[in-house]
Amino acid sequence: MPNCFKFHTVIERHWQKPYPVLSFLLKPLSGLFAKIAAKRRTDFLSGKRQSEKLPVPVVVVGNIHAGGTGKTPIVAALVSGLQEKGVKVGIISRGYGRKSKAVHVLNAESRAEDAGDEPLLLFRKTGAPTAVGSSRAEAGRALLAAHPDIGLIVADDGLQHYALRRDVEIAVFPSADTGRTDLDLLPNGSLREPLLRLDSVDAVVVSGGKADALFRPSENMFHSRIEAGRIYRLNNPSEILDTGRLKNQTVVAVAGIAKPARFFDSLRNMGITVKRTVALPDHADISAADLPDADAVIITEKDAVKFSDGICTDNVWVLPVCAIIEPDLAAFVLERLEDVPKAV
């Protein structure tokens, strides 16, 4: 695992600031990847490969990057916005990182190994019925069977899952990449699909800041920013941390997410002096035994769902975050769906 993590770290650095030698080696592979990805999409759109339509509208929220765009908080915000407008929303996802391959409809006893960390986090944050499966259509059928009153499904990270038909496509794109001219497809770059793909989606959500002035992939462009909530104790979420008491304590921050620097920066921006940071691979397994010794250990919400109740020590705290999307993305989705007939 450590060697794989180091190699992946090198590749990610290359994606952000390309190394000429690596680009020379990887560029031909990116060309091959582009042809395969284009053919796959064309086959589904032309009907050469079959896709399935669910009996309720499907809104796909995904990205053309290989992770790290800040999508999960945006999905949570969209689902919450739809719920506030009276819509019974369900969520489907692949459930990356879980131990089982079977379709799983989440319940109060579900764990990260059953559902994956991100779907479990979405389920707990929104309360929306949620199902996971490698086949999104199969997950959708199972979800509707368990919750027949669902009126709309949000598919988390399914933009390239063309086996499931969709009524609205939303792509999340990081603001840091909106002005770049050196983006490339995998493996030379971080893109799953070319930038032109953004011209065919219904909306683009620029995450983490404002877009470059020349970035106009869609007439329907939204912006999102992350707001940190109040840090709470993992063993007792109703207990809020008084950050002033950390002044003379040893604080360690631990994150198993795609862009851990964002999390560490958020803590520092809150005035917390972090003595040590621990960056783990995205979706990494983590338990109480893996946590460093410190007066206070602060972790992400995504990592927090991996802990079973009652097995963690009292020095572990969680920083919750939420996405603020402007203008109103949920209202846009409902307006878009007014002209979409219900599947039969």
Curated annotation (Swiss-Prot):
Catalytic activity: a lipid A disaccharide + ATP = a lipid IVA + ADP + H(+)
Biological process (GO), any one: lipid A biosynthetic process
Keywords in alphabetical order: ATP-binding, Kinase, Lipid A biosynthesis, Lipid biosynthesis, Lipid metabolism, Nucleotide-binding, Transferase
EC class: transferase
Pathway: Glycolipid biosynthesis; lipid IV(A) biosynthesis; lipid IV(A) from (3R)-3-hydroxytetradecanoyl-[acyl-carrier-protein] and UDP-N-acetyl-alpha-D-glucosamine: step 6/6
Gene Ontology molecular-function annotations: ATP binding; tetraacyldisaccharide 4'-kinase activity
Taxonomy, superkingdom: Bacteria
Pfam family membership, one: LpxK
Residue sites binding ATP per the record: H65, A66, G67, G68, T69, G70, K71, T72
Similarity annotation: Belongs to the LpxK family.
UniProt-recorded name of the protein: Tetraacyldisaccharide 4'-kinase
Gene field: lpxK
